[in-house]
Every structure is written in structure tokens, then in C-alpha cells.
Amino acid sequence: VEESQGSVQNVMEVAVRQGNYVFTTPPVLIKLAQNGGGAFKGKENPRFNEIRALFPIPSLTMHFVLRADSGVTKMSDLAGKTLLLGKGSFGAREGAKYLKLFGLEGKVKLANVELNNAVPALKNRQIDGFVTAGSYPAPNVIEAAAGTGITVLSMTSDQVKKSKRTRLVIPAGTYPGVNQDIVTTSLPVVAYTISQMSDETAYELTKNFWKQNSAMANSAAWWKGVTPKMLENVYGKIHDGALRYYDEIGVSV
């Protein structure tokens, strides 16, 4: 899921959908929709106030991945290095934004390589590192860690604040050889519905999601990062049916 035209369209559909419409989108788009901002300027609709949250799904998490022998341990060390951002993706746009915010624009050589070639490019020293955004643990970061040995950069509190994104900590040991917590940023993503969904349906959907979450984590590791604590990222109201389930399991929202 990306903060893309598709995510905007998911929210716009609320104006015409009825009943059991369920969609995923970053919470920031719900805020914009309900306040007539950004892509929703001039497209205000009272139905946007009927949007209700159900549960979080894996966030898009920023990774600045460097070869372990690159000598890079903090963002400022990127000056003079060759970095792969990719093209057109959320991670590429976000990575370019961060370089500018952190005073590195023009100081980092950007490699003209596609992101799907990042791991071999890192291994053959064509690049010093790459930037990727995905739910952690990200498969390409695991592959890089296993094949080359990596460092994943942490951001300072000031850098996180400048990004205007949500702070996220990737636990130590998530990636082979990376034995300390990684402080980074994320774009939360949440499953939403509308108030017309019955309380019982919302309750069952939410209950089944959390019951299945551990099974999903066994087949796709990034589901392990989804915890009830991520409900803190929700913007707007949570559906009454979902609230009933959270109350049952003792989760404060």
C-alpha cells in the first residue's frame, strides 16, 4: 500500500459506497478528506465523516541500507557516497525528500539503477547503499544482510521530527548482523470502513483479523510488526463494533 492515487481513490469511494465497504489507506488521508485538504480540496463530502477505523495493517517503513564496510553510521556520513533511491515509488520520493531535509541534496551521488537490482549492486560495490520503504522485515534488506553484511541507519529525534512522519523502532535482530534497535520513520496504513457497517460485522472482522494475525506472521514476517499499539496511529473514530472487541481484550484506544 502506498500513499498514492489509489489510496486517495479508496477514500473518495466512501462518497458512493454503502454498507460493508472496507478499504485501506494511510490515516493522514482520512484527516485531509475530513478537513477538505490536499487532494480533497473542493471535493468535500459529509460522508467522509462516516469513516470508521477497524485495525492497522503493516506500515511502510523507511530503510536506509548501507554496506557494513561503507563507514556510514549516521545520516551525515552519506555525503560523498553513492545511493540508490529507485524511481517513482513512495520510498524513492521519501528518500529524496529526506536527503533534502537533512542537508544532503547534491552531496550524495544517486545511482541510475532500478531498486530490484539493489542487492547485486550493493554486493558488487556499484553502490554504497540503497533506500527502500516496505513493511519490515523487508525481503530485499534480509537478502542484502545475508549476502553482503549491512548497516541500517537510525534517525535522530530531530530528523524524525523534520520528516513529519511517524516514529517507528525496528527491533534489534530483525535483520542478520544488525544487533541494535533502528529508529526510523513509517507511513501507517489502516483498514477502514463506514458507520453503516453493522456493529456485529465490524466486531467479527476485527476479531478474526487479530486471531489470524499470528498465523499470517508465520507465512509473511512483516505481519509480526502489527500490534494493537499501532492503533495510536489511527486518525478519526474507531467503529463501535471494533471498539467492543478491543474492550474485550483489554486494549485501550
Residue positions per predicted region:
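Bilobed "Venus flytrap"/periplasmic-binding protein-like clamshell domains
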Residues: 1, 56-124, 228-232, 236-241, ...
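Extracytoplasmic/secreted cell-surface and envelope-processing proteins
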Residues: 10-11, 31-33, 63, 92-94, ...
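Pocket-lining segment of extracytoplasmic ligand-binding domains
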Residues: 26, 35-37, 44, 70, ...
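A generic structural signal for alpha->beta connector loops
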Residues: 48-51, 80, 107, 149
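Ligand-binding clefts/hinges and TM-proximal coupling segments of bilobed small-molecule sensing domains
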Residues: 77, 81-82, 88-97, 166-235
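An extracytoplasmic/periplasmic, membrane-proximal ligand-sensing/linker region
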Residues: 113-117, 123-124, 134-147, 152, ...
